[in-house]
């Protein structure tokens, strides 16, 4: 199963990052075959580390600013939702991008689990 791990860049802090990484390990579905990432700092990088340590392929969707301008991160989030079969969202309670992605999952019928950190 293609699992997207999304969340705020606020998880760069070492202590918070270690907690978030542990939560990835606890919440990732057992049948995960690929990790999907947005390529940003924070939770996206932790997702890529998890994939490398568990020998899982990674699909990274980077925002295309040349094509979409300031909408690039939102378009990237939509691409992630369209590609993923399951989304694991780490939310800090304030990230608008994560909230948007969770709402997109619900709208598109993509299973999503929100983990508050």
Regions found by a protein language model. Give the residues of each.
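Acidic/glycine-enriched connector segments
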Residues: 2, 10-117
């Amino acid at each position: 199963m293609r699992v997207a791990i999304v969340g705020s860049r606020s998880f760069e802090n070492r202590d918070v990052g270690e907690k978030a990484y542990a939560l990835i390990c606890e919440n990732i579905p057992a049948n995960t075959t690929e990790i999907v990432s947005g390529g940003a700092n924070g939770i996206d990088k932790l997702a890529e580390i998890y994939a490398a340590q568990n020998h899982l392929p990674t699909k990274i969707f980077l925002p295309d600013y040349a094509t979409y301008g300031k909408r690039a991160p939102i378009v990237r989030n939509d691409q992630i939702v369209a590609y993923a079969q399951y989304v694991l969202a780490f939310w800090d309670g304030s990230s608008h991008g994560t909230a948007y992605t969770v709402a997109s999952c619900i709208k598109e019928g993509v299973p999503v689990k929100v983990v508050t950190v």
